[in-house]
From Swiss-Prot:
It comes from Chlamydomonas reinhardtii. Coiled coil: none annotated. This is Cytochrome c6, chloroplastic. The lineage of its organism: Eukaryota, Viridiplantae, Chlorophyta, core chlorophytes, Chlorophyceae. Its main location: plastid. GO terms for molecular function: electron transfer activity; heme binding; iron ion binding. Functions as an electron carrier between membrane-bound cytochrome b6-f and photosystem I in oxygenic photosynthesis.
Amino acid sequence: MLQLANRSVRAKAARASQSARSVSCAAAKRGADVAPLTSALAVTASILLTTGAASASAADLALGAQVFNGNCAACHMGGRNSVMPEKTLDKAALEQYLDGGFKVESIIYQVENGKGAMPAWADRLSEEEIQAVAEYVFKQATDAAWKY
């Protein structure tokens, strides 16, 4: 799913880049300075490529919530941790103890491999489910949406 999102974002960025060239050509024909315009559009395309590709779709988040509720909530209901209460799933806690920092990839690694009392889930969940639950946990933590 994320690969499809990446393709969509790349297509949008390519269209933005093409539009920038068209606008720049038209402005240049009128003798206008096109450097600031071209630069601004390039920055916009870059932002689309870096932020849009990492965002999860509503369907991905719904699957992530379903996987979380069916597999993770026994220990992590509402973002808590019933085994080690200090290691919640809020952003500040995840920033402290995730190997690799607070990012989806670090959550994926921990879900796949486990750590401490947390078991590895790579043999029980599909790659799609792990990706979705990692994006869900990341989004919940980023938005401070866990309900304690």
